[in-house]
């Protein structure tokens, strides 16, 4: 047997009192199955995160079946057994295992204790379920999962290194060096202050030497003024560093976010993306306010400890003993603290997503009489988030109380022992006062150091959340060839195009080949759900096909570069949106230089010019992101005008005239046809189909 095989067998042995099941929250709306597998793998020693699983197993936004989860588990080296069982039989399951929950979700059953069931829910965290609730939501299907013969204990997690983040900031090293030097001066003064007090009490007062007293006081005043000036300069340098980090980190992450593929956004909620982006602020705040403090606290702990040994001898070991007790308590409770922190972040993000979703659909909410229901659901989510915050605050208060108690006990013991040494003439009063001052600094610095180190561990949580965005591969690849911007009408061709939502599902379309000549108009028809919109997104470069190619003028769009390709085409999709600004800005795409004549011509072609001119402010009329004050047909015509303004070589239209009356639709179709643009449209209306050169059914 090789050493590697022996280590694998040892890793499979459970030699601890109890193996912990980690809590992993799902990021995408339909990856609860992956999260459950990640939790169980972590329990058995294979530490993997959702980023790794998502890359290896491309699941659909529509979710996974139990059979799909079973297949993924086997690829991870796990053995499985699917069971159909009654509620009373849950006690005999090998835990942790996966339960099918409420016919639309998967959770991990951790343990069964009498009539209480402990679940790790990827959507809600740790839950303690009663028998009645379990009976209501458990569907009777479970999946036992345990290490198979090919299972390996390993760590497959994705992180962003702090070094790479720091090196990405221009001017940060020089600023850090300046802050460090200023901090050394401040901390040196802090060490000198108790020495000055000791000199006054042991030399100036007993000798009645006012000259020495004045000299020491003047020196202390000088050091105080120097400390104040240095502290102000350090605060300004910290502000400069914070600004540098804030601008460069946020701009870099936002630019990366905008370049991620569309599928990234379709599988996530906006509130969760916002929450992950906000985690960057938490990292920045921790780095700018705590890293320098951590370095100086470390130096001061050593320096103060040396001073205590010089002044107090064995009393120093008493201080170290009480300090160790506090550190031990913090370390023991760290796991629970991190779990509550993650729970708080996830619940806040869920409430924010629900809030934005409600506002985006406010008209539907009102018409369907859902105001009370949506309000109650949001309130419940917000209360869950607040309760998590209360748990976190409660733990902070507990730690503060423990620190106060330990420090007080330490102070009393040192007072009793130190006073005894003074009485026995083994220590002067000045030395005792100085030692007490050093003891206070030591306890304060160690508590701060412990909090920072644990906070740094908590930062790994924010690191994971940011990594989900920052380490996701961008859709843009470096173009291999240069393309002239204005190419006129463009030919479109596909060769053997195939696409599926994930590796577990059947293809939406397979080996699809079609060609559209320059200036030709083609309509794509088919039954609802046949994949027309998905095909359109593949043709537009929003989705990458599993196989096959999309070519324009005989050139693969991947050679051109997705961004370059998007500059050559225009799309009007079913779910298009307007942005906050004027109608002029929306039609012109918020360009710095706007072509007034061309804008009006595009508005006339989309049959919206007269409507705009009848508005009090004309093209300067302000609209919001939801397009308030405009009908559905008016919005669609503005979308079409916006697409035409780009002077595209190909115009893609997905039910782009579905909200128009027949007269307006006919006018728009004829106007666009006369522009000699290659058109690919999805439509069902006969009036639209009559204006195209060819119809393709899928």
Curated annotation (Swiss-Prot):
> In the UniProt entry, which residues are flagged as the active site?
32
What would be an example GO MF term here?
ATP binding
What is any one of the record's Gene Ontology cellular component terms?
plasma membrane
The subcellular location is: Cell membrane
Tell me the superkingdom of the source.
Answer: Bacteria
Domain (Peptidase C39) ranges: 26-145
Q: What keywords are assigned to this protein?
A: ATP-binding, Bacteriocin transport, Cell membrane, Hydrolase, Membrane, Nucleotide-binding, Plasmid, Protease, Protein transport, Thiol protease, Translocase, Transmembrane, Transmembrane helix, Transport
Q: Which GO terms describe its biological process?
A: bacteriocin transport; protein transport; proteolysis
Sorted alphabetically, which InterPro entries does this protein's record hold?
AAA+_ATPase, ABC1_TM_dom, ABC1_TM_sf, ABC_transporter-like_ATP-bd, ABC_transporter-like_CS, CvaB_peptidase, P-loop_NTPase, Peptidase_C39
Identify the PANTHER family for this entry.
ATP-BINDING CASSETTE SUB-FAMILY B, COLICIN V SECRETION-PROCESSING ATP-BINDING PROTEIN
Q: Which family does it belong to?
A: Belongs to the ABC transporter superfamily. Colicin V exporter (TC 3.A.1.110.2) family.
Report what the protein is called. Colicin V secretion/processing ATP-binding protein CvaB
Naturally occurring in which organism (per UniProt): Escherichia coli
Whichever gene encodes this chain, its name is cvaB
């Amino acid at each position: 047997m090789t050493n590697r095989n022996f280590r694998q067998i040892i890793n499979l042995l459970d030699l601890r009192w109890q193996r912990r099941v980690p809590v992993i929250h799902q990021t995408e709306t339909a990856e609860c199955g992956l999260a459950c597998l990640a939790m169980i793998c972590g329990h058995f020693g294979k530490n993997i995160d959702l980023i790794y699983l998502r890359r290896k197993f491309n699941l659909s936004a529509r979710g996974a079946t139990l059979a799909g989860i079973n297949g993924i588990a086997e690829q991870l080296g796990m053995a499985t057994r699917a069971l159909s069982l009654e509620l009373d039989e849950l006690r005999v399951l090998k835990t942790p295992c996966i339960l099918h929950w409420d016919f639309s979700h998967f959770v991990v059953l951790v343990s069964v204790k009498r009539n209480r069931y402990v679940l790790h829910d990827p959507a809600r965290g740790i839950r303690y379920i009663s028998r009645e609730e379990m009976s209501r939501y458990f569907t009777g299907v479970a999946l036992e999962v345990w290490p198979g013969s090919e299972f390996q204990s390993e760590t497959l997690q994705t992180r962003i290194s702090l070094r790479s983040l720091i090196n990405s900031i221009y001017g940060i090293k020089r600023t850090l060096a300046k802050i460090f030097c200023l901090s050394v001066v401040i901390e040196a003064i802090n060490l000198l202050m108790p020495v000055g007090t000791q000199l006054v009490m042991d030399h100036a007062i007993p000798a009645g030497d006012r000259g020495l007293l004045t000299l020491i006081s003047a020196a202390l005043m000088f050091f105080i003024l120097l400390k104040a000036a240095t502290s102000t300069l350090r605060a300004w340098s910290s502000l400069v560093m914070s600004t540098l980090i804030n601008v460069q980190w946020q701009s870099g992450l936002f630019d990366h976010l905008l370049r991620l593929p569309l599928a990234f956004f379709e599988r996530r909620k906006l509130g969760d993306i916002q929450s992950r982006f906000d985690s960057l602020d938490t990292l920045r705040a921790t780095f700018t306010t705590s890293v320098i403090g951590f370095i100086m606290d470390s130096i001061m702990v050593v320096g103060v400890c040396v001073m205590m040994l010089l002044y107090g001898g064995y009393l120093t070991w008493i201080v170290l003993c009480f300090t160790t007790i506090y550190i031990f308590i913090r370390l023991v409770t760290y796991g629970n603290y991190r779990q509550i922190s993650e729970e708080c972040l996830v619940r806040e993000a869920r409430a924010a997503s629900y809030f934005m979703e409600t506002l985006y659909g406010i008209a539907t909410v009102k018409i369907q009489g859902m105001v009370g229901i949506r309000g109650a659901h949001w309130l419940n989510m917000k209360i869950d988030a607040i309760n998590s915050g209360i748990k976190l605050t409660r733990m902070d208060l507990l730690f503060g109380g423990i620190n106060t108690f330990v420090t007080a006990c330490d102070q009393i013991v040192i007072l009793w022992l130190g006073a005894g040494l003074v009485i026995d003439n083994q220590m002067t009063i000045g030395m005792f006062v100085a030692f007490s001052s050093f003891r206070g600094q030591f306890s304060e610095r160690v508590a701060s150091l412990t909090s920072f180190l644990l906070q740094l561990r908590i930062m790994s949580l924010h690191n994971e959340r940011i990594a989900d965005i920052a380490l996701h591969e961008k859709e843009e690849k470096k173009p291999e060839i240069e393309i002239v911007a204005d190419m006129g009408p463009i030919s479109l061709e596909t060769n053997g195009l195939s696409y599926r939502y994930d590796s577990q599902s059947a293809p939406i379309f397979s080996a699809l080949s079609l060609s559209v000549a320059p200036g030709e108009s083609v309509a794509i028809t088919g039954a609802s759900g046949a994949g027309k919109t998905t095909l359109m997104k593949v043709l537009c470069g929003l989705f990458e096909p599993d196989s096959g190619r999309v070519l324009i003028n005989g050139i693969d769009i991947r050679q051109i570069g997705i961004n370059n390709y998007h500059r050559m085409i225009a799309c009007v999709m079913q779910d298009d949106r307007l942005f906050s600004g004027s109608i002029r800005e929306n039609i012109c795409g918020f360009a710095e230089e706007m072509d007034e004549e061309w804008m009006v011509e595009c508005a006339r072609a989309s049959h919206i010019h007269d409507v705009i001119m009848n508005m009090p402010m004309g093209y300067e009329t302000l609209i919001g992101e939801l397009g308030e004050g405009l009908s559905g047909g008016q919005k669609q015509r503005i979308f079409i005008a916006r697409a035409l303004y780009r002077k595209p070589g190909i115009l893609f239209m997905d039910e782009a005239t579905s909200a128009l009356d027949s007269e307006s639709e006919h006018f728009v179709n004829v106007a666009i046809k006369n522009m000699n643009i290659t058109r690919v449209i999805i439509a069902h209306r006969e009036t639209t189909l009559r204006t195209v050169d060819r119809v393709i059914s899928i």
